[in-house]
């Protein structure tokens, strides 16, 4: 077999037989393409009408632009026929008319310098067959008029499609006698900048825009595009950009339908320009809570920002259910000590230990690693490590996040529990950390990542005076983690079960087995039995070995009434 010496790109003639698949086949695509052509032709307005005729429903689109100069290029796939200025600035593909492919279409047009207009009728099969179509004279004012036979689907979608197409379109659009609403694509922008033939609008929203939200507007044609979103490190505020393209030839759309942007250096430059515009908007406000990394990025883009506002939030312990960090009240202008983040059970026990006294010489605040690098953040003392030292008759061990515990560890009283905090004076300090010790009375040690309190060791100091209710609440906050499997009980049911188990465990440890069992029985009766008892009636019960006896008691039997309650 002999191979050719060269090859080159060509367009196969068979592509003409696939023109009905170049666009999605919806009326919205067709309207956008025809409106763009009217704008390029210099029209001052576009009139759209729905005509109900005997042969069906017709969509007529009329503009007063320059008209179609060369009708031979009308159906030439890839030949736009536009003058060089428009070809340079807008990159027309010469495919827009094929958004009508497969439909019965009549096109009339006349240029300003022509004595007569012309008309061509395109039957549905002609779009793919390539058959010759006759041009005939037509009486028409300057401009172009297109009539399209509507299917039921296009008829149903037409009104909304016209409204959407006209929303950001720069020319007046009339549907029947009614002018369609128009608004600026950058409406409600906090600030607008001009950049390389574009207008960049900066908007305030702490949430990242949805990936399908339109971020770029091309004369009424809007597309989603990934553009920068900058937000405060603590989620208070956010900024994002939208772009109105005016004349930017290097920003290109994927052809033919222009529903997404071509990923090229021009788009990369636009993203960087949007980012810089956001930082300039923030600079004008004079304050921010950006991360140190974002602050450095602004400097790279030539935008000088002050350091983030120097405040932090009071440290509050996490709960296992969400594992989220909930900021406490704002702390500023006073001594602070930055607390590192630990698992929920450790944070809950640390919080209880530290409430017994101060000793830290400052408010304990939640760490914000995003601020590491700012001068004011580096200057605060910080907890660099912590552990609980537990002493029993037989041994001493330390417990911290990730530490192993003795295999035979079980719930009960121990000699002492001590919280040890390693505190460093500043982030850059080369001095050894100070070790601060605080007496603790409770330590909860889960041995598995679940809500089963049977796998939790509860250690109490000798002098611990915690109540059963307090201990039950501490257990739930430290250990409850709902099972989200599809076959699991509801969140409410799981939480109720955990609460009951926590109360039982607390009663067992603090009151003894008999008291714990009796309280659990009372709770079960209150929850599952009392609603069956008629109002103002009393029932006495006797239960042993799964045998339950019950009888109505006299109404004046106060003990029975009290027990039922």
Where in this protein do the model-derived segments appear?
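GHKL/Histidine-kinase-like ATPase module
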Residues: 155-272, 313-335, 340-350, 429-447
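Conserved DxG motif in ATP/Mg2+-binding regions
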Residues: 59-65
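Mixed-charge (acidic/basic) macromolecular-recognition segments
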Residues: 243-312, 460, 468-515
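Long C-terminal appendages of very large multidomain proteins
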Residues: 358-361, 378-565
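Flexible ATP-lid and adjacent glycine-rich G1/G2 motifs of the Bergerat
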Residues: 66-129
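Bergerat-fold GHKL ATPase/HATPase_c domain
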Residues: 1-43, 54, 72-75, 255-258, ...
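Short beta-strand-loop-beta element adjacent to the nucleotide/active-site pocket used for signaling
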Residues: 52-59
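Flexible, glycine-/charge-rich segments associated with ATP-binding catalytic modules
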Residues: 1-4, 105-109, 125-172
């Amino acid at each position: 077999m002999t191979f050719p010496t060269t090859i080159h790109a060509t367009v196969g003639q068979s592509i003409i037989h696939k023109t009905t698949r170049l666009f999605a086949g919806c009326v919205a695509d067709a309207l956008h393409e025809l409106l763009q052509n009217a704008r390029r032709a210099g029209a001052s307005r576009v009139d759209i009408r729905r005509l109900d005729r005997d042969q069906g429903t017709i969509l007529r689109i009329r503009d007063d632009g320059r008209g179609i100069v060369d009708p031979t290029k009308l159906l030439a796939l890839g030949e736009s026929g536009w003058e060089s200025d428009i070809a340079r600035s807008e990159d027309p593909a010469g495919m827009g008319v094929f958004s009508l492919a497969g439909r019965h279409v009549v096109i009339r047009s006349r240029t300003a310098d022509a004595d007569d207009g012309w008309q061509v009728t395109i039957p549905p099969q002609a779009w793919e067959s390539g058959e010759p179509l006759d041009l005939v004279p037509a009486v028409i004012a300057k401009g172009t008029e297109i009539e399209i036979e509507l299917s039921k689907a296009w008829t149903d979608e037409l009104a909304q499609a016209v409204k959407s197409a006209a929303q950001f379109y720069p020319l007046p659009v009339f549907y029947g006698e009614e002018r369609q609403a128009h608004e600026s694509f950058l409406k409600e922008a906090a600030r607008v900048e001009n950049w390389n033939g574009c207008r960049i609008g900066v908007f305030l929203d702490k949430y990242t825009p949805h990936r399908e939200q339109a971020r770029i507007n091309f004369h009424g044609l809007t597309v989603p595009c990934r553009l920068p979103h900058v937000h405060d490190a603590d989620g208070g505020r956010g900024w994002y950009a939208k772009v109105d393209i005016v004349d930017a030839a290097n920003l290109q759309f994927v052809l033919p339908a222009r529903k997404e942007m071509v990923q090229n250096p021009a788009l990369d430059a636009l993203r960087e320009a949007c980012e810089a515009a956001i930082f300039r908007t923030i600079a004008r406000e004079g304050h921010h809570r950006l991360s140190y990394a974002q602050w450095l990025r602004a400097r790279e883009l030539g935008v000088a920002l002050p350091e983030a506002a120097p405040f932090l939030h009071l440290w509050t312990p996490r709960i296992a259910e969400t594992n989220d960090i909930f900021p406490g009240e704002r702390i500023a202008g006073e001594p602070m000590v930055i607390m590192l983040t630990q698992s929920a059970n450790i944070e809950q026990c640390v919080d209880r230990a530290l409430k017994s006294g101060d000793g830290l010489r400052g408010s304990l605040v939640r760490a914000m690693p995003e601020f590491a690098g700012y001068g004011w953040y580096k200057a605060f003392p910080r907890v660099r490590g912590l552990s609980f030292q537990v002493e029993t008759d037989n041994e001493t061990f330390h417990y911290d996040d990730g530490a192993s515990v003795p295999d035979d560890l079980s719930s009960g009283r121990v000699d002492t529990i001590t919280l040890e905090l390693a505190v460093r004076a500043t982030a850059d300090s080369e001095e050894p950390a100070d070790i601060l010790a605080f007496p603790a009375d409770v330590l909860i040690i889960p041995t598995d990542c679940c809500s089963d309190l049977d796998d939790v060791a509860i250690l109490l100091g000798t002098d611990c005076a915690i109540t059963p209710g307090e201990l039950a609440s501490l257990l739930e906050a430290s250990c409850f983690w709902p099972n989200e499997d599809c076959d699991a009980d509801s969140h409410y049911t799981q939480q109720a079960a955990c609460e009951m188990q926590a109360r039982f465990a607390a009663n067992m440890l603090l009151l003894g087995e008999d008291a714990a069992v009796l309280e659990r029985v009372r709770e079960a009766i209150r929850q599952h039995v009392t609603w069956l008892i008629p109002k103002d009636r009393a029932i006495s019960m006797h239960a042993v070995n799964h045998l339950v006896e019950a009888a109505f008691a006299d109404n004046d039997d106060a003990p029975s009434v009290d027990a039922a309650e």
